[in-house]
Amino acid sequence: MDKIVIRGGKKLKGEIVVSGSKNSALPILFATLLTDDPVMITNVPSLTDIDTAIAFLNFIGKKTVKEGNTVKAYSSYKYKHIAPYDLVRKMRASILIMGPLLVRLKRIEVSLPGGCAIGARPVDIHLAAFKKLGAKISVKGGYVKTSAKNGLKGATISFRVPSVGATENILLTAVLAKGKTIIKNAAREPEIEDLANVLTKMGAKVMGAGTKNIEIEGVDKLHGFMHEVIPDRIEAATYLIAAAITKGGVILKKVIPQHLKSVNDKLKKCGLCIKETKNTISAEWVKNLKPQNVKTEAYPGFPTDVQAQWMSLMCLLNGESCIEENVFENRFLHVSELQRFGADITVNGKTVNIKGVKEFSGAPVMVSDLRAGAALVLAGLAAKGKTVVSRIYHLNRGYDMLEKKLKKLGADIRIIHN
């Protein structure tokens, strides 16, 4: 199993280009199922989740190829209506196959999805919404069987929580359903807006994406598109924290600063010097930073996908801080690994209390999920001595060219291939 070896204590300095957003690229890839016309998607990151999605599309019957950071999808073969466990288990976003295939084939069987082991990420919100649109659903033998023999009809759907995946799935479905669909308490993430922009390019009628209420007027047919995926705000946040935790300075290019407002506001309060232009962010350590409490929330609040990285930083700041996780349960699996570096952390339900320590000592650690892996790499970069990070396949799901980018910033990091 591959490992990352880090010799920490170096200040990271330099410039990097932020990759395209995985969380935007995945639903856009599944949107290609809504048309038989050619499509081209650029700024697609090179990640195992992207490879899995492309393999998935080809299996279903959509000819899809990736060359560099560009994905092209062509006219479809006859689509399969079954998405098997062997493919679905690798990636939670595979649940997004349901909407496009249901609206086009009027039936779909999808194995319950996999992904990171970070607590309950229920699909019941998706299924309840499909029922509102007129689908019949049964769950048997680990598969969700969904059918709509008479087609789908628009409806008003109110989510109990602003689920990103469910919002995307209903967007992908309602654009070809009959009549108007209204999504209330919709997710507001930038990735939702990016998907809506793609659907609009395809000829869909979508209004209100990026707000709590989205309206979709169904159309009869969608056509091809060209689109550049937005930058990855979570990757960008991770490198900003890397500058802070190593007392260095980085310049991020090809980034959208407004997508990182909640993170940047907290970093500024810590004392990190942050400057923004239209598509760049610079972050520089100029003085000892002060800890700041955070509560994770749906966008535009502080992102749950930055919680673990933030924890690594707080562990090394003089003083006490608190992190409250309000989005996912069981998302503190990285705590025990950070304690191996010397972190002073106490878990109390959905809250962690942190007492800053003077320094970390390098240690062997194990990754439990994607963002936990990023937190451990950050800790290793700041620690004295050697850190060995195992189970790095999680990192390959969400960080494009991680080793190369960190080396460019001056990190002593290498991957050992076993």
UniProtKB/Swiss-Prot annotation:
Phosphoenolpyruvate binds at K22, N23. Transmembrane segments: none annotated. It catalyses: phosphoenolpyruvate + UDP-N-acetyl-alpha-D-glucosamine = UDP-N-acetyl-3-O-(1-carboxyvinyl)-alpha-D-glucosamine + phosphate. Keywords: Cell cycle, Cell division, Cell shape, Cell wall biogenesis/degradation, Cytoplasm, Peptidoglycan synthesis, Pyruvate, Transferase. GO terms for biological process: cell division; cell wall organization; peptidoglycan biosynthetic process; regulation of cell shape; UDP-N-acetylgalactosamine biosynthetic process. The modification 2-(S-cysteinyl)pyruvic acid O-phosphothioketal is found at C116. Its main location: cytoplasm. InterPro entries: Enolpyruvate_Tfrase_dom, Enolpyruvate_Tfrase_sf, MurA_subfamily, RNA3'P_cycl/enolpyr_Trfase_a/b, UDP_GlcNAc_COvinyl_MurA. UDP-N-acetyl-alpha-D-glucosamine binds at R92, D305, V327. The active site is at C116. Cell wall formation. Adds enolpyruvyl to UDP-N-acetylglucosamine. This is UDP-N-acetylglucosamine 1-carboxyvinyltransferase. The lineage of its organism: Bacteria, Pseudomonadati, Elusimicrobiota, Endomicrobiia, Endomicrobiales. The gene is murA.
